[in-house]
Amino acid sequence: VIIPTPIFPLYIPIVLLNGAKPIFIDTSEDGFILKPEKLQKAIEANKDTVKAVVLNYPTNPTGVTYDRADLEALAAVIKQYEIFVLSDEIYSELTYTGKHVSMGEILPDQAVVLNGVSKSHAMTGWRVGITAGPADVIQQIGKVSEFTITSVTTNAQRAAEEALKNGMDDTQPMKEAYMKRRDFLIKALTAAGLTVPNPDGAFYIFAKLPERMHDSWKFVYALAREAKVAVIPGASFGPGGEGYVRISYAASMADLKLAAE
């Protein structure tokens, strides 16, 4: 299973627990975007064994997203092989520039799209996810789901249905609040000497540490001890993550201002 990194670390143990091997592509030199030529190279090097490619966008931890041209270029590569793309689009409604484009729209016969209401409606604790893809694939996923989680509780399903039917406009004020927090943090972190990209989505900043502080684990431990501020070491997100830290702006503006001080 090909996994572009840095990426949400949960994918890696899931691949391992299913007896598969993760194949990492470091995207840190490419603006944290998976490039089609690097994808093709990785597939060709493992052509007899590759079954899937993982995409997550807007991405945790970088906040980077893919536009239509990016996705079409990747789809052109994937179409050449009998493989699937597992497209985790849980942050789709938290896209700040342009409109989110789903890989399911571009590659319907080979894409399995994951989404839910956790991020779009701040319903993380309800544990309601959505999977869409080719009918035969979804049928097999249903079998696995039945014997692992059985089903989502009825009240959670009804709450998610209400959110999707009558609460789609609720995301907008939340997104506007995130953008204000993002802009505040970018300004504060830049003033502190960190290199900070402008995230296109989600609610994370993946800030590059000064070279003298390159060890992200040491940095986050020191920050927690001395400033009582918790961030995540970039090294925990796979190859290409070292030398960075992930900062969440899902916290309140008051807490972010206190942390910045």
Describe each PLM feature range.
Residues I2-E261:
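PLP-dependent class I/II
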